[in-house]
């Protein structure tokens, strides 16, 4: 079985590498699938993130047509505040708007991971509750100026400077970073990949 990560995210690549526990025989390649990430009318956040993870895995599988026995991992992460999906910011003003909305509140981070093979696709969903401290305008301005939030769902990275804003989490840290390790290991183990 040839493992493929359907993502160019450096965070997902690093997390998937951790699953190998340093073993030289744990290898994977990466592809960059292109899918439409527009939510469907009335689609619930849980359904949306699981659909995107599966579509990324299947689109990645289509890119591996010449590969022997590909098993493709797709993943997607969203931040949900009061039932609104907060994706990646479109610009700095949007990042500031999102951070102001998260300030002093709890939100849910949902990450879905899917494994697609020729005959089946399996999906796991992980949810983590994250509570932010109250952010000042100066905090928000400085953080956005760092550019860190610009490629991240919810406009922050818990593993970077944005971790300064996290008061507490309930659930999986790796879910918030972008690839839930326990659930990903389970999917790989069920597929015979160790």
Curated annotation (Swiss-Prot):
SUPFAM superfamilies listed in its UniProt record: ITPase-like (SSF52972)
Top EC category: hydrolase
Marked site (Important for substrate specificity) residue numbers: 11, 77, 159
UniProt subcellular location: Cytoplasm
CDD domains attached to this UniProt entry: Maf
Residues annotated as the enzyme's active site: 76
Main location: cytoplasm
Gene Ontology biological process: nucleotide metabolic process
Presence of keyword Disulfide bond: no
EC code: 3.6.1.9
Pfam families noted in UniProt: Maf
Reactions that this protein is recorded to catalyse: dTTP + H2O = dTMP + diphosphate + H(+); UTP + H2O = UMP + diphosphate + H(+)
Cofactor: a divalent metal cation
One Gene Ontology term, aspect cellular component: cytoplasm
GO molecular function (one): dTTP diphosphatase activity
Keywords tagged on the record: Cytoplasm, Hydrolase, Nucleotide metabolism
Superkingdom of the organism of origin: Bacteria
PANTHER family xref list: BIFUNCTIONAL DTTP/UTP PYROPHOSPHATASE/METHYLTRANSFERASE PROTEIN-RELATED, BIFUNCTIONAL DTTP_UTP PYROPHOSPHATASE_METHYLTRANSFERASE PROTEIN-RELATED
Function noted in UniProt: Nucleoside triphosphate pyrophosphatase that hydrolyzes dTTP and UTP. May have a dual role in cell division arrest and in preventing the incorporation of modified nucleotides into cellular nucleic acids.
Family, similarity comment: Belongs to the Maf family. YhdE subfamily.
Protein name as it appears in the record: dTTP/UTP pyrophosphatase
Record organism: Shewanella sp. (strain MR-4)
Source species taxonomy: Bacteria, Pseudomonadati, Pseudomonadota, Gammaproteobacteria, Alteromonadales
